[in-house]
Structure formats: structure tokens, C-alpha cells
């Protein structure tokens, strides 16, 4: 056999093995960085974490066995009916109904208790027969429990959800105003309900509603109802009543905007600001500005101050699902197409509807106010989601609303 043939045979008999080069530092094991006392505590708490995680999964309808969760729900309903009876009219079948409700309540309560005990016993037996969990598995289970608790905390924090919703619609909503409206609305709503529904039925309704809140059917129903404008108006009840005073018109004009915006005006010496006023003026504009100042009939302009106010008008648009173009049609409870930010007496800000910038520029200014800029200066669009939460300066699939500012300055001597 020649040399080339021998080399070829040796090459074919060789096995090719992949060699991985780790150029980056690997994550250290949790066993090496976790103190022994914490590791021991987590190991002993592992069965409790499993029980708690399974209970949260059933409450949030995350279990794979939906039928078992429905059986639990039915048993809870029958048990609640035993402890919270419903007032019924007297009839010949009333004793039989009470006995049936008593029997079903006891059986359902016993079923829930025995089912829970059977799960605990089977879990302990399973943990004895299997290998002990690693620290990584315990940490993953702990993170799962914390994530579920975080979801439940956000769902139960009704105040925060309403506050964020109202802030997105009306820029900023004070906690005091929100509490007053929720208290008044909630009190009237409770009185109406308690007039026609017994306390037992009322309590059972809220308990069962809380238990089925996370089901896919309930969430799908809420999403379908949210598509109706009447439902959204009912949810945001009271937003349109956030007004400075009741006598203000629907669309603010310059004669209302200037007094309401006086708090943002700045006062500067006339000698310092006059060159800046005349800097960008050409031709007859110089004469016009000087004539406006001379018409004030001031003897000594050197000691006079000039009040400058900047007006900011927000232009808002929305994009609907059936149309890819941006539209000026907005929902009734949210911002108007053109609005201005007004400061309330308690320090909060309110968005009030106003005329378009072109319409405001054509109006006659009150109290010897005069425009500094000849035209309105517009900013770039700021894109937001459906709740007017800012996303960025570029349009995306998540952006359904957008807003920009139109600015123009005035002066008053």
C-alpha cells in the first residue's frame, strides 16, 4: 500500500469532535453564591411553595385541567350558599329547599377540604419518592409565585388602575378629585343595588366575580364590551366635569385663555428684551412694534417691565383599526382635537378644548396684548398608545394616538 492510500485510510478512521471555546464568563451556580442557611430555608419551604403556586394557578385559571377548576368553583358557590343564604318568599317547598341547600353546602365544603388534604398528602408522598429539587428549581418556582402575586396585586389595586386611566385621558387627575367622584358615584351605585338585591346575593356576586375574573371567557367579554363607546363613557364618568368654572364655553378663546394662563407669564425688563423683539422683524414690523410700545404712553420706558406669555396648543389625532390614516375624530371622553393645558386651583392640570391655532391667531387680543411671533411654531409628533401613554417620536404598530404642540408668544407692557 502506498503512502497516499495509507494516509487516506487513517483520515477516514478519524472522528471529528467539536470544540467549544468559552470566551465569556459563565454564570456561577446558585449553590456557590447562596448562603447555606438560605438554601436550607428554601429547601424546607419548597412544599409550601408548590401548594401556594398551585392555589394561585387555580385562582387565576392557569391550570391545565379546566374542568377541575370549574368543579372547585361550583363547590365554592354551593359552600357560600350554605353560609350566606338567600332570602326567599315563603312557599310549600321552602323546608325542602333549605334541607337541599344545607346538604349541598356540607357536601361541597367536605369535598373541598378532602380534596385539599388529598393534594397535600399526595404531594408529600411524591416529594419523598423523587429526587430532591435543585436550588435552581426552587428559585424558578419562587419567581413563578412572585409573578402571580404581582399580577393579583395590580388587579386588586383599583385606585392605581383608575388613576392611570384618568391620567392618560385627562393628562393629570388629582387624587382628591378622583376620590370625591368615586365616593359619590360608588355611594349612589351601592344604594341602588342594595335596594333591589339582598346583601347575601350581593356578597356572593362579588365573590364569584372575583373568582372568574381571570377566565378567558370573562376577559374576552370585557374586551368586547370595551369596544362600545357607551361602556367607555360609563367607565370614565366625571372626566368631562373637570372644569375650572361652569360658565366657561365649550371651546376656549383667547379672551379666556390669557387670564387662565397668567400664572405662566414671565416679567422681564423692557430694555433687555426690546432688541430681541426687533431682531427678527423686517421692514414695517419694526415700526409696528415701536408704535405698539409708544401707544402705551409711558414716560420712561427704561424702568418698565414687559410681560411675556407663551401659548401652547395641543393638536391630538387618533388612528382607528379600519383606517390606516390619522383622523381628527376622537372618543367623546378623551382629549379634543385642539386643547390647551389649564392649571386648576389645587395645582393639577386639566386639558380644555380650544379653537385651532389659526382661529386663535385671527382673534382680537384683549387688554393690549400683542403677538410677538408672526406665526405658530409646531413641534414634531409624539406618538402614544391607545391610552395616550407616550411611546416615542416614531410611528409603530402600538401607536394609536399622537400629539404635537403649537407655540406662539405674546407680550404686554
Swiss-Prot record:
Show the InterPro entries listed in the entry: Peroxin/Ferlin, Peroxisomal_PEX28-32, TECPR1-like_DysF
Localization recorded for this chain is: Peroxisome membrane
Tree of life domain = Eukaryota
- Transmembrane parts of this sequence: 67-87, 104-124, 182-202
Keyword field: Membrane, Peroxisome, Transmembrane, Transmembrane helix
Pfam families named among the record's database cross-references = Pex24p
* Ranges per topology, Cytoplasmic: 88-103, 203-413
Which residues does the entry place in the Peroxisomal compartment?
1-66, 125-181
Q: Which GO terms describe its cellular component?
A: peroxisomal membrane
The residues the entry assigns to the signal sequence are: none
Instruction: Write down the membrane topology.
Output: Multi-pass membrane protein
**Gene Ontology BP terms:** peroxisome organization
The record's family statement is:
Belongs to the PEX28-32 family. PEX32 subfamily.
Q: What is this protein called?
A: Peroxisomal membrane protein PEX32
Q: Which organism is it from?
A: Saccharomyces cerevisiae (strain ATCC 204508 / S288c)
The organism that produces this protein has a lineage beginning with:
Eukaryota, Fungi, Dikarya, Ascomycota, Saccharomycotina
Amino acid at each position: 500500500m502506498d503512502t497516499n492510500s495509507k494516509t487516506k485510510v487513517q483520515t477516514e478512521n478519524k472522528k471529528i469532535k467539536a470544540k467549544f471555546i468559552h470566551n465569556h464568563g459563565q454564570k456561577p451556580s446558585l449553590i456557590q453564591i447562596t448562603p447555606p442557611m438560605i438554601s436550607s430555608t428554601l429547601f424546607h419551604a419548597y412544599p409550601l411553595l408548590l401548594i401556594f403556586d398551585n392555589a394561585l394557578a387555580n385562582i387565576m385559571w392557569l391550570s391545565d385541567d379546566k374542568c377541575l377548576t370549574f368543579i372547585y368553583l361550583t363547590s365554592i358557590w354551593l359552600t357560600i350558599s350554605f353560609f350566606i343564604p338567600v332570602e326567599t318568599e315563603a312557599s310549600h317547598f321552602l323546608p325542602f329547599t333549605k334541607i337541599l341547600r344545607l346538604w349541598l353546602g356540607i357536601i361541597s365544603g367536605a369535598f373541598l377540604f378532602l380534596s385539599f388534604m388529598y393534594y397535600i398528602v399526595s404531594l408529600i408522598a411524591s416529594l419523598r419518592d423523587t429526587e430532591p429539587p435543585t436550588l435552581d428549581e426552587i428559585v424558578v418556582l419562587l419567581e413563578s409565585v412572585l409573578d402571580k402575586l404581582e399580577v393579583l396585586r395590580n388587579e386588586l389595586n383599583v385606585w392605581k388602575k383608575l388613576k392611570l386611566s384618568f391620567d392618560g385621558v385627562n393628562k393629570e387627575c388629582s387624587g382628591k378629585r378622583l376620590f370625591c367622584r368615586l365616593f359619590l358615584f360608588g355611594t349612589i351605585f351601592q344604594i341602588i343595588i342594595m335596594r333591589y338585591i339582598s346583601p347575601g346575593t350581593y356578597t356572593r356576586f362579588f365573590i364569584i366575580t372575583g373568582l372568574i375574573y381571570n377566565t378567558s371567557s370573562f376577559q374576552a367579554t370585557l374586551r368586547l364590551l370595551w369596544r362600545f363607546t357607551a361602556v367607555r363613557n360609563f367607565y370614565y364618568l366625571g372626566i368631562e366635569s373637570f372644569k375650572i368654572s361652569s360658565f366657561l364655553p365649550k371651546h376656549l378663546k383667547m379672551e379666556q385663555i390669557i387670564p387662565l394662563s397668567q400664572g405662566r407669564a414671565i416679567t422681564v425688563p423692557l430694555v433687555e428684551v426690546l432688541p430681541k423683539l426687533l431682531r427678527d422683524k423686517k421692514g414695517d414690523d419694526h415700526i409696528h412694534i415701536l408704535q405698539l410700545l409708544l401707544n402705551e404712553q409711558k414716560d420712561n420706558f427704561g424702568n418698565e417691565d414687559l410681560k411675556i406669555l407663551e401659548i401652547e396648543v395641543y393638536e391630538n389625532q387618533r388612528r382607528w383599526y379600519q383606517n390606516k390614516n390619522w383622523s381628527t375624530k376622537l372618543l367623546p371622553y378623551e382629549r379634543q382635537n385642539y386643547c390647551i393645558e389649564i392649571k386648576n386651583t389645587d395645582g393639577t392640570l386639566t386639558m380644555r378644548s380650544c379653537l385651532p391655532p389659526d382661529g386663535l391667531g385671527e382673534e382680537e387680543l384683549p387688554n393690549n396684548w400683542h403677538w410677538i411671533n408672526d406665526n405658530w411654531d409646531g413641534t414634531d409628533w409624539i406618538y402614544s398608545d391607545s391610552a395616550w401613554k407616550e411611546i416615542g417620536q416614531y410611528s409603530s404598530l402600538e401607536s394609536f394616538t399622537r400629539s404635537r404642540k403649537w407655540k406662539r408668544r405674546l407680550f404686554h407692557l
